[in-house]
Regions:
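Bacterial Sec-dependent N-terminal signal peptides
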Residues: 1-4, 14-47
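Ser/Thr/Gly/Pro-rich, low-complexity flexible regions
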Residues: 1-7, 142-144
């Protein structure tokens, strides 16, 4: 009786191990190509005047060409002053061919920020209308 149970269980165990060893199928995104900030709120802990922070700009699909995206500061929604409290390295971001991420590089000026300040600014991506995802939008708030 024990031999018969082992004869059934051993092949069953081997079959389970064989099936578990198969490569899983990964679900990939196949929808439209959108460009957006990876988050809608970023916090920069500015500790010196030389550190840069990367604010990721992401695309939902990789392309075989470079994508240039313009970045602008919305002054009406900002209380930090560009050039005094922070600076943006470039007003454009490049998402390179075959990649999904480009970065807006921002530097904060610690010497011009008081510990009592509550500063922030709002960024907006300038993208073609067909690359704008209505669900997430193209803006991000940055707290300094």
């Amino acid at each position: 009786m024990k031999k018969r149970i082992l004869t059934i269980l051993v092949p069953l165990f081997v079959a389970v191990l064989w099936l578990a060893g198969c490569k899983p199928e990964y679900t990939t995104y196949s929808g439209p190509n959108y460009i957006l900030f990876s988050d809608t709120l970023y916090e920069m802990a500015v500790v010196d005047d030389s550190a840069y922070f990367n604010l990721p700009v992401v695309a939902t699909r990789a392309c075989d060409y470079d994508r240039n995206v313009a970045v602008e500061v919305i002054d009406a929604a900002s209380n930090a002053i560009e050039g005094k409290h922070y600076s943006i390295e470039s007003n454009s971001v490049v998402i390179k061919a075959g990649e999904l991420v480009g970065n807006v590089r921002v530097k904060g000026y610690h010497s011009n920020i008081s510990v009592y300040d509550s500063l922030g600014f709002k960024l907006q991506l300038i993208v073609p209308e067909n690359a704008e995802w209505d669900l997430y939008g193209t803006t991000a708030n940055v707290l300094v």
